[in-house]
């Protein structure tokens, strides 16, 4: 089950039907990762820089906003509460503008990135980063989104 909390109302102005959009991304990813049948509960909070900066400071001691924060709660098992993913619209807008990509594509990427973190993937070491990015690229491709790690013309 995907629980979606729209903390920052501006999401409605930027993403068409944000709840349906989020469910499509997460469910497509869970199916492709062969874990949909576990029926995990995942909470997604559509937030802003203010909340992400507060959480980033509280949990990571970094006093600045960020694009996505993930909080894993349980290892994957049937019907578990897997974790929470928080995304900041403000940061995603700035980054997608800088990258010259649609906000929907960048949001999809960050949601998948956050999902992989709550599934215990990380990018601390080069091999881990390669594995995580490869999975992101594959999942984004399923959604019709180009590889975000290939430099684009601006």
Swiss-Prot record:
Entry keyword Hydrolase: yes
Record-listed Zn(2+) binding positions: 113, 117, 123
Function statement: Single strand-specific metallo-endoribonuclease involved in late-stage 70S ribosome quality control and in maturation of the 3' terminus of the 16S rRNA.
Domain of life: Bacteria
Name of the protein this chain belongs to: Endoribonuclease YbeY
Known EC number: 3.1.-.-
GO molecular function: metalloendopeptidase activity; RNA endonuclease activity; zinc ion binding
Pfam families for this protein: YbeY
GO cellular component: cytoplasm
Cofactor note: Binds 1 zinc ion.
Keywords: Cytoplasm, Endonuclease, Hydrolase, Metal-binding, Nuclease, Ribosome biogenesis, rRNA processing, Zinc
Organism whose genome encodes this protein: Ehrlichia chaffeensis (strain ATCC CRL-10679 / Arkansas)
CC cofactor: Zn(2+)
Subcellular location: Cytoplasm
The family this protein is said to belong to: Belongs to the endoribonuclease YbeY family.
GO BP term, pick one: rRNA processing
